[in-house]
Amino acid sequence: MIIAGSDGPISLSIPVVGGRSVKVSYKEVQIDYTGNWQRDHFRTLCTAYGNSAFFMFYRDELEILYKESPVFLYEWNLSCLHWLSKKLKIEKIINIKNDGLSIPESFDDDLYKPQSLGNDSDNKLFRYHQVFQDKTGFLPNLSILDPLFNLGPDVKSYLLNASTKL
């Protein structure tokens, strides 16, 4: 995931057992807990978004999420997805079945992809205030956490409005 920091974009990734070169199915990718990525990610989010308008309303729940220690990466991703679904008030649920992901037919995944809002030069009307915007300029295509922490409950209507203008 990519978030906005004071010096520009920050990439946060979860280490996996065997690294990127491991050749296993998605549901078999295990998280590597030899480092303290959870603490580092959470601290980075606190530093980057501590002064945003809505971070304080999500901080405690996010901290609980970062204290979870699922074995598999898909479990972490699913926990995050369910948390975000609640925050965005998305009622369609994505479930894991033995044969893979189950996504409702009417689920519009393009709406929630960063590139769906286009690039910065094409979509100046989709801007919102970012914490370090005065220093870095507007940074497009960041994690959903960026508009969530900056727009709060209005993030869903922002995404819906932006998607109808593409």
Regions found by a protein language model. Name each.
Residues 1-166:
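Residues lining hydrophobic/aromatic ligand-binding pockets adjacent to catalytic sites
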